[in-house]
């Protein structure tokens, strides 16, 4: 049986299996058939702004209908909005057509349960098993119905605003927002301006091809430049589907996911709101954040890379805060998935209440330098049996001593080997990363 699901749903190049119309048709039928085993079912489908979303939306819709499942179409919608709306519309599942921070040539799909949580490993296995079966349509009298939901944007906008302390206001704050020409393009202004902020939006004119193109959470140069040019208080960058958040301080410096998690954790602990006094992160989480949390007697729990694994551990440990340096931040007391919009509001609430700048808020954490290198691969590489790589890693770890570390892993969403060298000293980190990447040349 093929394993189609990676760490964040199914993703790949458009037109190459499994990102094809015929596969998505079969996928819709497979998921629908699994859901229909519990009785009459309905799903909602949202998508980001890439051009191929229209193709795959129609294919999934047809697959669900052929399994007897009703389909509510949302149109362009952030991933976390679909997670929320799945619950408010009382759907059995939510579907997002997106490749997150990737460019328009890629696409993919993610699924949420009726509770707004990403499908479990067991759910994914049931779907993959159904994909091996012949596609048998329901009878003509049992075909599902399709319809378009009215005003889903308004519901999500009001929900986002409700997570911000309404005794506070963003009045007087000048904020630049980069929507990555993605799914937040028609939402971000309303959320932040209605809470009082002066908003300047960039990269909010999607054309189907410019999603994440030199913009958004994975490419913040434009945002940093505009923050400085307009002398803004801060900048906010989302990725293509709105589940990631990176911020820029008033000096044009990046504030990444680990720093933002620390800012929230410190504030919530001081207010007695950090349930179980724990934060969940991944093996890529910055050492500086770990040490800063330790100094506050906040427990840090490490899991594998992927916000699904972070969420699973948060549920096990009773934690309400977790995430990744890439900007996936989960505030489980506010919502059920990583949500860039809601995470930004939590940081802004801390900023307003403390009357501090973003630069001041991040000073309590001394971030280590992380040098990240992605190595493209054509065929699968067995990292455990790669003698040259292991030897190079030993040499780099000896060079780092107790002042750093090495993480090498295969990407769960792309054909890449990801190398990360972390150290207090930037020069040493760069030297170590170069040595490891040279193994693949």
UniProtKB/Swiss-Prot annotation:
Enumerate the UniProt keywords alphabetically.
Isomerase, Magnesium, Metal-binding, Phosphoprotein
Q: Identify which top EC class this enzyme belongs to.
A: isomerase
Name any one GO molecular function.
magnesium ion binding
Q: Which Pfam families does the UniProt record give? A: PGM_PMM_I, PGM_PMM_II, PGM_PMM_III, PGM_PMM_IV
Enumerate the active-site residues.
100 (phosphoserine intermediate)
Q: Which Enzyme Commission number(s) are listed?
A: 5.4.2.10
Catalysed reactions, as listed in the record? alpha-D-glucosamine 1-phosphate = D-glucosamine 6-phosphate
Post-translational modification, briefly? Activated by phosphorylation.
Is Magnesium found in the keyword set? yes
Q: Which residues carry this modification: Phosphoserine?
A: 100
Q: What is its cofactor?
A: Mg(2+)
Which residues are noted in the entry as Mg(2+)-binding?
100, 239, 241, 243
Its Gene Ontology cellular component terms are:
cytosol
Keyword set includes Amino-acid biosynthesis: no
According to its UniProt entry, the protein's GO biological process terms are:
carbohydrate metabolic process; peptidoglycan biosynthetic process; UDP-N-acetylglucosamine biosynthetic process
How the cofactor is bound: the record states:
Binds 1 Mg(2+) ion per subunit.
> What biological function has been recorded for the protein in this entry?
Catalyzes the conversion of glucosamine-6-phosphate to glucosamine-1-phosphate.
Family per similarity comment: Belongs to the phosphohexose mutase family.
Q: What is this protein called?
A: Phosphoglucosamine mutase
Give the originating organism. Vesicomyosocius okutanii subsp. Calyptogena okutanii (strain HA)
Protein's gene: glmM
């Amino acid at each position: 049986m093929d394993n189609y699901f990676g760490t964040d749903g199914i993703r790949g190049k458009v037109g190459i299996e499994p990102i094809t119309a015929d596969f998505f048709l079969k996928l819709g039928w497979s998921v629908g058939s699994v859901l229909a085993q519990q009785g009459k079912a309905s799903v909602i489908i949202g998508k980001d702004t890439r051009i191929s979303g229209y193709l795959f939306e129609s294919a999934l819709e047809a697959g669900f209908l052929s399994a007897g499942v009703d389909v509510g179409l949302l149109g362009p919608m952030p991933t976390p909005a679909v997670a929320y709306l799945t619950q408010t519309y009382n759907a059995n599942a939510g579907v997002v057509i997106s490749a997150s921070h990737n460019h328009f040539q890629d696409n993919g799909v993610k699924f949420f349960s009726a509770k707004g949580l990403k499908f479990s490993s067991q759910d994914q296995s049931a779907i993959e098993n159904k994909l091996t079966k012949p596609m048998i349509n329901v009878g003509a009298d049992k075909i599902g119905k399709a319809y378009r939901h009215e005003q889903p944007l308004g519901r999500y906008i009001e929900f986002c605003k409700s997570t911000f302390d309404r005794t506070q206001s963003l009045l007087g704050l000048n904020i630049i927002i980069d929507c990555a020409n993605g799914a937040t393009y028609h939402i971000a202004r309303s959320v932040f301006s209605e809470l009082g902020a002066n908003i300047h939006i960039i990269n909010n004119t999607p054309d189907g091809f410019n999603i994440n193109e030199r913009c958004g959470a994975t490419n913040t140069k434009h945002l940093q430049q505009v923050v400085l040019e307009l002398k803004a208080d801060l900048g906010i960058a989302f990725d293509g589907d709105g589940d990631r958040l990176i911020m820029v301080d008033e000096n044009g410096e990046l504030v990444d996911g680990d720093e933002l998690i620390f800012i929230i954790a410190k504030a919530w602990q001081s207010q007695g709101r950090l349930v179980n006094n724990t934060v969940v992160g991944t093996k890529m989480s910055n050492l500086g954040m770990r040490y800063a949390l330790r100094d506050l007697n906040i427990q840090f729990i490490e899991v594998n890379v992927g916000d699904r694994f972070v969420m699973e551990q948060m549920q096990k440990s009773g934690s309400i805060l977790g995430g990744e340096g890439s900007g996936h931040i989960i505030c489980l007391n506010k919502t059920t998935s990583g949500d860039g919009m809601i995470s930004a509001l939590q940081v802004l609430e801390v900023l307003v209440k403390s009357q501090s700048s973003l630069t001041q808020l991040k000073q309590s954490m001394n971030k280590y330098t992380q040098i990240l290198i992605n190595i493209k691969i054509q065929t699968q590489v067995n990292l455990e049996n790669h003698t040259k790589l292991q030897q190079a890693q030993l040499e780099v770890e000896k060079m780092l001593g107790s002042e750093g570390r090495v993480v090498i892993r295969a990407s769960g969403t792309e054909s890449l080997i990801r190398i990360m060298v972390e150290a207090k000293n930037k020069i040493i980190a760069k030297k170590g990363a170069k040595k490891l990447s040279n193994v693949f040349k």
